Amino acid sequence: MNPIVKQFKYGQHTVTLETGAIARQATAAVMASMDDTTVFVTVVAKKDVKEGQDFFPLTVNYQERTYAAGKIPGGFFKREGRPSEGETLIARLIDRPIRPLFPEGFFNEIQVVATVVSVNPQISPDLVAMIGASAALTLSGVPFNGPIGAVRVGFIDNQFVLNPTMAEQKQSRLDLVVAGTDKAVLMVESEADILTEEQMLAAVVFGHQQQQVVIEAIKEFAKEAGKPRWDWVAPQPNTDLINKVKAIAEARLGDAYRITEKQLRYEQIDAIKADVIAQITAEDEEINEGKIVDIFTALESQIVRGRIIAGEPRIDGRTVDTVRALDICTGVLPRTHGSAIFTRGETQALAVATLGTERDAQIIDELTGERQDHFLFHYNFPPYSVGETGMIGSPKRREIGHGRLAKRGVAAVMPSLAEFPYVVRVVSEITESNGSSSMASVCGASLALMDAGVPIKAAVAGIAMGLVKEEEKFVVLSDILGDEDHLGDMDFKVAGTREGVTALQMDIKIEGITPEIMQIALNQAKSARMHILGVMEQAIPAPRADISDYAPRIYTMKIDPKKIKDVIGKGGATIRSLTEETGTSIDIDDDGTVKIAAVDSNAAKNVMGRIEEIVAEVEAGAIYKGKVTRLADFGAFVAIVGNKEGLVHISQIAEERVEKVSDYLQVGQEVNVKVVEIDRQGRIRLTMKDLAPKQETEINQEDSVEEQE
C-alpha cells in the first residue's frame, strides 16, 4: 500500500488529504485532516441504474465516533446510537452544496459516508468533512462537476477571520460557512450578531475567495490519485414524447397556473397530469409513466419561469417584491406561557414559548465534552399542513434543519441567563405551508417570546427570497411560494431585526450567481423584512411587562458558599424536603446563588425563609425556640436554627435536680433554650435555666424574606 498524500496550508491551519491505504473497495476514500481533526470519507457509486429510477438517490451520512476524543459512549450498550441532531445538521451541510453538481438525468445511487475518527477540540469536524467529501467525489470518477471548497468565516474586532478556532468563535459576531466551486457560491449557512447586509455579503465574497486554495489542492490531488471519469452520457430527450405532452397540456397548464389558491391549483394540475398520462399510455402502453411525469414537470417549470422572466404577474398575482397578506394573533392559548399565530398567505405557524428553570436546560454530549443549551427551538411539520396524510413520529432531517435555522434567526436577540434566568423553549407548529415555513417560524417565535414576557433585544422577522435566471436575464422574488422554490434557481432566507441580519441561509441550484445578484436579493429581503416587522410591531410593540401567571417565577438569594451543604443536607434530604413540602424548584450555584422557581409567590417566600433559618449563624448567649429531637440519659438534643442540634445537659433542664429527662421533656416538644457555648468542633451547648422570655431571639420567616426581597 502506497498512499498518495496532498498537504496544503489553509489560513492558520494545515490540511492533509490521503488516499490509497484504507477502504480500497469503496469507489473512493479520503482521510482528510486539519490540525489533528480527522474525518474519513468514503464514496460508493453504483454503475447500474435501477429500472424505473426517476430521481437521483444521493445519501450523505455523517457520524462521530467517541473514540475520536478518547471517550467511551455512555448508556447501557456503550456504543454509538442513532445520529444526533448535530450529526444530522452536518450531514445536510455536506449534502446541500454537492447535490446540484451532479448532471440532470444522472440517477445512479451514490452514498457518501463521513466518519470522524480524531478530533482536536479547537477544530470543528464539519469543514473537514465537507473538504473530504469534495475530494472523495472528485477522485471517484463519477460525473461530479466539482470540486467544491468549504470555509468558515468569523468576524472579530471588525475583521473577517478565516476558519476561526473554537476559542475564536466564542468572540466572533459571525459564524458563516460558505461552500462553492471555483466560479460560484453554492451554499451559505450562517448566524450573526445583527450585522448589516453589506457585512454579510462581504463575508460571503471573502469566504469564496479564500476557499480557492482548497479547490486547487483537490484538483492537483485528483490529477495524481483520481480514477478515470465515468463514460456517462445524459439521456437524449424524447422529442416526440415532449411534443405530445405539450400538445395535450401546455395551454391547460397555462390556465391552471393562473389559479391563485394552492389547493384548487394543485387539483387542476393533478387532473391535467392524469389526463396526459392516460392519453399517452392508451396509445403506447410501453411508455414509462415516470418519463411522462418528468416532461410534464419540465413544462410546468417553463411556463412559470417564462412568465416571471417576461415580467408577468407571479402564480398568485403578486409583483416580484410583494409580500403576501399578513395576519397576526398573540396570546392565543390560555394556559401556555406565550403564544402566537403568524400567517403569511397560505403559510401559517403556531408558535408557543415555554419558560423553565435551569434544570430544564438540555445537556448536549459532544465529542469535545458536555455543554448546556438554555434556548431550545423545535419545528414540527405535520402532513396536514399541506393537506396530506402521512406518518407522524420523530423529526426528520428537514424538520431538524428548519428548526436550527429558525433558532439561529432568534438566538442573537435572546437575553443572557444573567438578564433573564430562565430556560426558554419555543415550538413552531406549522399548520399551513406554501413556502417559507422556517421564516414564518422566526416571526412566530419572536411574537410568542414577546407574549411570554421574554425581554428580547428586538423583534425578529424572516423572509425567503427566490431567483429565476435565464442566460443574462434574472428576476429576484420576495416571499416565494412552494412552487417558486421548487421551480426556481435559488432559496435565499434572511432573518433579522430593523438593525441588521441574524441569520442567512442560501442554497443555489445553478452556477453564475454573482455578488450583484446576492446584493439585490439582500436589499429586497431587507425591504420585505421591514414591512413584516412593521405589522408585527402593531400586534405587539414590546415584550409583555410581566410573565404569565402560569409560568414559574424565579426568586434569587445569596448564601455563604460554605453553607450550601447545610441547605442540601445529607444525601439531599434537606433540599428534597424543601421542594416537596413547598412545591418549588431550587437550584444552588457554587458561588452561593440560590434560585427558587415557584408559580406561587407565597411558596417562594416560605422556602426562602426556611433557607434563611438553615444558614443562620447560632450566636452564643442568644435565646431560641427549638424542638426536642431525641432524649438520652444525660440530656436532650434540641434542634434550633436551621435544624442545628445542641445538647441540653440533664443538669441544665430545670433549676431543681432532674432524675429522669423524660419526666420533663418529650420528643417533638417545643422549648426555649439559651446558647451557652459553641466549642471548636461546632458543638452547641444549651441551657433551659435563667431564661428571660421577653428577650427571646426567634427567627421570623416573613421578616427574613422581606429583607431578601
From Swiss-Prot:
Q: Where is the S1 motif domain?
A: 621-689
Which EC number(s) does UniProt give? 2.7.7.8
* Enzyme class, UniProt record, top EC level: transferase
Q: From what organism does this protein derive?
A: Haemophilus influenzae (strain PittGG)
Kindly name one Pfam family recorded for this protein: RNase_PH_C
List, alphabetically, the Gene3D superfamilies matched.
Answer: GHMP Kinase, N-terminal domain, K Homology domain, type 1, Nucleic acid-binding proteins
Query: Which keywords appear in this protein's UniProt record, sorted alphabetically?
Result: Cytoplasm, Magnesium, Metal-binding, Nucleotidyltransferase, RNA-binding, Transferase
Under CDD domains, the record lists: KH-I_PNPase, RNase_PH_PNPase_1, RNase_PH_PNPase_2, S1_PNPase
Q: Where in the cell is it found?
A: Cytoplasm
The similarity comment for this entry is: Belongs to the polyribonucleotide nucleotidyltransferase family.
Q: Which GO terms describe its cellular component?
A: cytosol
- State a single Gene Ontology molecular function: 3'-5'-RNA exonuclease activity
Give the protein's function: Involved in mRNA degradation. Catalyzes the phosphorolysis of single-stranded polyribonucleotides processively in the 3'- to 5'-direction.
SUPFAM superfamilies linked: Eukaryotic type KH-domain (KH-domain type I), Nucleic acid-binding proteins, Ribonuclease PH domain 2-like, Ribosomal protein S5 domain 2-like
What PANTHER family does the record tag this protein with? POLYRIBONUCLEOTIDE NUCLEOTIDYLTRANSFERASE, POLYRIBONUCLEOTIDE NUCLEOTIDYLTRANSFERASE 1, MITOCHONDRIAL
Domain called KH: residue spans? 552-611
Binding locations of Mg(2+): 485, 491
Gene for this protein?
pnp
Task: Give the protein's recorded name.
Answer: Polyribonucleotide nucleotidyltransferase
State its cofactor: Mg(2+)
Q: What is the lineage of its organism?
A: Bacteria, Pseudomonadati, Pseudomonadota, Gammaproteobacteria, Pasteurellales
- Gene Ontology BP term (one): RNA processing
Q: Specify where it is mainly localized.
A: cytoplasm
